[in-house]
Curated annotation (Swiss-Prot):
Keyword Calcium: no
Entry's free-text remark on domains: The central ion permeation pathway is formed by the first transmembrane domain from each of the five subunits. Mg(2+) binding strengthens interactions between subunits and leads to the formation of a symmetrical homopentamer surrounding a closed ion permeation pathway. Low Mg(2+) concentrations trigger both a conformation change within each subunit and a loosening of the interactions between subunits. This results in an open ion conduction pathway. In addition, this results in a less symmetrical shape of the whole complex.
Entry keyword set: Cell inner membrane, Cell membrane, Ion transport, Magnesium, Membrane, Transmembrane, Transmembrane helix, Transport
Species in which this protein is naturally found: Campylobacter jejuni (strain RM1221)
PANTHER family on file: MAGNESIUM TRANSPORT PROTEIN CORA
Protein name, UniProt field: Magnesium transport protein CorA
Function: Mediates influx of magnesium ions. Alternates between open and closed states. Activated by low cytoplasmic Mg(2+) levels. Inactive when cytoplasmic Mg(2+) levels are high.
Length: 327
């Protein structure tokens, strides 16, 4: 699908659902958004505007040169967008699952071109802003500027959610030890660490693109000034994500210590039980020997006496352990 945003004579912005077969390209184009484009649509736009869009393989390359490149007429950016899926599991705990989608931005003749294969809330928000406040969007670079600003805000929201969950986990570990399982807690910590690293990678990707845009002579002074402000916010978020990783590592350390304490308690119980059972075991072993000459076996009260000695030999170590504070 091709969505074309054009500037009208009364300084408003109009959105057109463009059809290749029945329409001609309008004048005063601000933005061409290619959503789930067909090969014919990409070929048409490439031919009309003398553009060369990256292939799927080029979009997925990790080299810096594949993320941003610029020539005399165009700028092309392959940016990573995080898509957030919120769903509840069987225990009604909110879990966030992220996936990474690549969006291609290209500029030519002050027109913005975007290629994407999924719906994004960022695009919906930008589209609403353009239609509501068209005077703030004079060309495609204004849209890119606001696009990065909104994306950084979205990443900030994700980091705030991660921070909230990390604090909840810390409270659970310290104050509600009996209300969770260690396996569940470790899984939650691991999930938050993975989310944090994904958001941080997304921030790094935006920082590289914004830094390159600031070096471009195609960007005017006002946009560069706003990008600089957004870049400062982004750097603060990177530092915040690092502090969150440290918090999660701290929670994991506390949890590991608690697991060790629980294991030590179990080992202590088995150790005490083993030591307490050694004397009666020894007594039983002695009197279980098949020697012919064991005169005490002939005594009338031998059996209850031996049982009593065995019970005393169990109780005595337990009393000693209790006084020592080992129980």
């Amino acid at each position: 699908m091709l969505y074309i945003y054009i500037k009208t004579q009364n300084a408003l912005v109009q959105r057109i659902n463009f059809n290749l077969d029945s329409q001609e390209l309008p004048q005063n184009i601000l933005w061409i958004d290619l959503l789930h484009p067909s090969a014919a649509e990409i070929a048409f736009i490439s031919s009309e505007f003398n553009l060369e869009f990256p292939t799927k393989e080029e979009r997925e390359e990790i080299e810096l040169s594949a993320k941003y490149w610029e020539d005399n007429a165009t700028i092309t950016i392959n940016a990573h967008f995080l898509v957030r899926d919120l769903k509840n599991d069987e225990e009604d705990r909110n879990l966030i699952k992220l996936r990474t989608e690549i969006v291609t931005f290209a500029t030519a003749k002050n027109i913005l071109f975007t290629i994407r294969y999924n719906e994004f809330s960022t695009f919906e928000e930008i589209q609403a802003r353009i239609l509501a406040s068209p005077k703030n969007f004079e060309d495609g670079f204004d849209i890119i500027d606001k696009m990065f600003e909104v994306r950084v805000e979205k990443d900030a929201d994700l980091l705030e959610w991660i921070d909230k969950e990390a604090r909840r986990l810390r409270t659970s570990v310290l104050e509600k030890k009996d209300e969770y399982s260690y396996d569940e807690m470790l899984k939650d910590i691991s999930s938050l660490q993975e989310l944090n690293m994904r958001v941080r990678d997304s921030l790094f990707d935006k920082r590289r693109a914004m830094t390159s845009l600031l070096k471009s002579d195609k960007i005017d002074k006002d946009i560069k000034q706003n990008l600089t402000i957004v870049l400062k916010d982004l750097n603060s978020l990177v530092e915040f994500s690092v502090s969150q990783l440290n918090i999660l590592d701290n929670i994991q350390t506390i949890l590991a210590s608690q697991i060790n304490i629980e294991q030590n308690k179990i080992i202590k119980i088995f150790t005490v039980a083993t030591v307490a059972m050694m004397p009666p075991t020894l007594i039983g072993t002695v009197y279980g020997m098949n020697f012919k000459f064991m005169p005490e076996l002939e005594l009338h009260y031998a059996y209850p006496i031996v049982l009593g000695v065995m019970v005393i030999s169990i109780i005595l170590p337990l009393v000693v352990f209790k006084k020592k504070g080992w129980l």
